[in-house]
Amino acid sequence: MDKEAAKRRIEELHEILNQYNYEYHTLDRPSVPDAEYDARMRELISLEEEHPDLKAADSPSQRVGGAVLDAFQKVRHGTPMLSLGNAFNEQDLLDFDRRVRQAVGDDIAYNVELKIDGLAVSLRYENGVFVRGATRGDGTTGEDITENLKTIRSIPLKIKRPLSIEVRGEAFMPKPSFEALNEKRLQNEEEPFANPRNAAAGSLRQLDTKIAAKRNLDIFVYSIAELDEIGVESQSEGLDLLDELGFKTNKERRTCQTIEEVIELIETLKTKRADFSYEIDGIVIKVDSLAQQEELGFTAKSPRWAVAYKFPAEEVVTKLLDIELSVGRTGVITPTAILEPVKVAGTTVQRASLHNEDLIKEKDIRLLDQVIVKKAGDIIPEVAGVLIDQRTGEEKPFHMPTECPECHSELVRIEGEVALRCINPECPAQIREGLIHFVSRNAMNIDGLGERVITQLFKEQLVSRVSDLYRLTKEELIQLERMGEKSVENLLRSIEQSKENSLERLLFGLGIRFIGSKAAKTLALHFGDIDQLKQATKEQLLEVDEIGEKMADAVVTYFEKEEILNLLNELKELGVNMTYTGPKPVKVEESDSYFAGKTIVLTGKLEEMARNDAKAAIEALGGKLAGSVSKKTDLVIAGEAAGSKLTKAEELNIEIWDEVKMLEELKK
């Protein structure tokens, strides 16, 4: 076929395949069998391979993936992608309605939409062609994920009119795709995704676009961010226009004239939640009129004209099949409920937390009981109660053992503690869990050394002490399951890099009782190096800000042990850094930062900056981080899904910032 004929045929195939895509993925009404679609796609790819210069940016062939990216570029949003304020009950909705009416009067209509549990994205079109897609990021700056978004077949690569427009939507993984993906991951002995939202986010942040293309993602577009020339006067009109242009919008939407009508609709939608083929975590209520939206405006972190009603934690009933015991790195014995598989909050749950023996006794939890399992968002499922009236007589009381399930040493209960402990320092489970803790993100942060690899290394007797990690060789690692040459090289590089970590990471990784990451940082900063710390007396430790008696006793006891001193000498000889190399906090009187001398609480999920990095940056400018909100708190920085701490800050009239404002202050 000559070039001119190829060009004409490619244009025809574009039109045909775009129509097939629209019918199948947007209208859910395919007009041809899959085999016909596949044949036309193969024809297009073949022609584009023959004539590479005829391959257009909006070609349907872009949906199969193939490009491998080096990194995601930053994208600044022309119109910020702000998060929404939350409503958790009927009173919150009535308060929202009252605020709206006080501002713009009683002539109000609300547009009610499902809150899809996925990843918020922005899609930019120039002259009708999809040119850029980005994540929300911190609301001001996101990441360019255009190539991965092109693999979502419900995103039109070319819309039905040559408009320049930016739209917002929620990319998600449908429930059937999520279940199939996790089943495949389990077959490959890979860690399953916790929920469809994590799976969608992970898929769209793959540098290899072929992986994203295989994940069967979908999208609902829910708003127009920027559009010239065409007059749209309401949210509902905007959604109708999006439909006309070929975007996929959610049809479970309605315009309500009163807040009471909204509340009634929410109750109806709650009952349908399990029937949707995608996860929802709430309902979004928006003032329908765009003129009224403009009049209401924004707070620092969210629009005043919209609110997200969040569903309460989901509860289901299932059978308790067994109670499994595990041994943590400090010897604590933790019971876990083994359940008859049940769907809760979007995932299949087979295990749930029982916390400790006292909870089992308090709730009179018995084997084979019908139990209530509760899960909200990403939290670990927990057994919230028992249906005693459904007992049949086959249920059996559960008794905690007197011996460690791993090493069979006698278990003890330390005075004042709820938990049973194994106090055998040679207990294999404690050693293994200690190694897992040592390499974890907040400790030595050795990338590639997760629980699976550590368990293998321990089982093969290649490591039994943390110092053994620094003696591992390529020859030893290459013999492990699913460890290729490249993986081994990356792992050895990561182990070597961890030697340069600042002292606080090592201290936290060693697992000294009562010393969390914050206390480890405080001690490292105060003493400067391990030699000064291990010689410190209890009195000297108590002089350190925020170090209490239990912590001081634990540190002194830890460094009195000969085996610990030998371990530290080994690590030093192996090249592990033993000094504090992190930023030194600015003295309050020397800092002109807003944070200097203030007590600050971080709450919710930060999108742009890791929480630990944000803490370190604030502390370096003289700020003091606190874990809870009180009258002494000067500032609360609220990220996504901030909860009770934000509510308390509002009650106490404490200043509240979002992540965007925090980043602006840090950049000064």
UniProtKB/Swiss-Prot annotation:
InterPro entries: BRCT_dom, BRCT_dom_sf, DisA/LigA_HHH, DNA_ligase, DNA_ligase_AS, DNA_ligase_CS, DNAligase_adenylation, DNAligase_N. This is DNA ligase. The keyword GTP-binding does not apply. NCBIfam families: dnlj, PRK07956.1. Zn(2+) binds at residues 404, 407, 422, 427. NAD(+) binds at residues 34-38, 83-84, 113, 136, 170, 286, 310. One of its GO terms (cellular component) is cytosol. The gene is ligA. Its cofactor is Mg(2+); Mn(2+). GO terms for biological process: DNA repair; DNA replication. It comes from Bacillus pumilus (strain SAFR-032). Coiled coil: none annotated. The keyword Lipid metabolism does not apply. One of its GO terms (molecular function) is DNA ligase (NAD+) activity.
